[in-house]
Each structure stands twice: as structure tokens, then as C-alpha cells.
């Protein structure tokens, strides 16, 4: 179904936004410039850091050179493939590998590219959503917050060293 040039996926994506949650309007309208009143109500793309866009572009370049640019818009993608890739890139970054040793592309940029491909494929109606059946994980996370507080109280007098990447290699 199409409506005003949008696919059902676009309409559903907009409907999925949380009701009543709008970004704060920290803009100021100036009477002297009529464009301010209109422009300040548009999507604030300037909020996306240019550094992130630039680094993510390297991940998209890698993909374009390997598979062809925008290939997912034609061939389609399965969500699980990109979710797996995001998990692998995050695990590598979390464990100290900032960039892929073969390509030099930032793992975090690859995570961003994967997420953007999923969103774009969904927008274009080319996403096969093969995520597992829904589970109440959000409710579980909220419920476990009580356990976090209980554990923090239980161990409040313990002050072990909290190791980070700056502590060196394990032996």
C-alpha cells in the first residue's frame, strides 16, 4: 500500500514512534527572518555529528566496493545478518580492536552502517524481518533494575579495582 509516495513501511515506522515524545524546541524564532519560523520546525540534521557521518562513509565505501552501492535496496536483506555483524563489530571494539585490521575501517562505523542499512531497507520495503518472536525484554530490564540496586546496597562496602582497557593485557 502506498500513501502520498510513502510505502507502508514508512507509515508504520512513523506510527511506531512513542506517543507524546517530541524533541525539545530550543530554537528561537526571529521576526526579522521568515525562514527561521519555517526552518526551525524541520528535521534538525545538523545534530548528527559530521565525524560520525564521515567515519560511517568509510564503512559504506567498503561495502560499495565489495558488494555494490545500495545493493540492499535491490536484493533486500535479512535483519539477522546485519544484527550478527553489529554484534561482531561491537564485540571486537569492546575488546580493544578499534578498527578492522584488514580494512582499517572503524568497527563503530561498521555498526552505524549496519544499523542504517536495516533502517533504509525497511523504509524501502526490502527488509526481511527475521528477528525472533517478541519477548518482554524491556519489562525484564526494568525489573532487573531492582536487582542492581539490591546488589549495590549489598556490596556498598566493597571497593575492588574496576579494570579497564588501560590496565593492560591479561596474562
Model-identified regions with their sequence ranges:
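Intrinsically disordered, low-complexity regulatory regions
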Residues: 3-171
Amino acid at each position: 500500500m502506498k500513501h502520498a509516495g510513502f510505502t507502508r513501511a514508512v507509515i508504520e515506522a512513523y506510527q511506531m514512534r512513542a506517543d507524546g515524545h517530541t524533541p525539545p524546541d530550543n530554537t528561537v524564532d526571529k521576526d526579522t527572518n521568515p525562514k527561521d519560523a519555517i526552518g526551525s520546525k524541520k528535521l534538525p540534521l545538523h545534530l548528527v555529528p559530521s565525524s560520525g557521518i564521515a567515519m560511517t562513509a568509510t564503512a559504506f565505501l567498503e561495502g560499495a566496493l565489495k558488494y555494490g552501492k545500495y545493493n540492499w535496496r535491490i536484493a533486500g536483506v535479512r535483519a539477522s545478518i546485519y544484527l550478527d555483524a553489529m554484534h561482531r563489530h561491537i564485540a571486537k571494539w569492546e575488546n580493544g580492536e578499534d578498527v578492522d585490521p584488514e580494512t582499517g575501517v572503524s568497527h563503530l562505523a561498521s555498526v552505524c552502517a549496519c544499523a542504517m542499512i536495516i533502517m533504509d531497507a525497511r523504509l524501502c520495503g526490502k527488509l526481511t524481518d527475521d528477528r525472533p518472536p517478541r519477548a518482554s525484554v524491556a519489562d525484564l530490564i526494568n525489573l532487573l533494575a531492582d536487582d542492581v540496586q539490591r546488589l549495590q546496597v549489598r556490596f556498598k562496602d566493597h571497593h575492588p579495582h574496576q579494570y579497564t582497557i588501560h590496565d593492560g593485557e591479561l596474562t
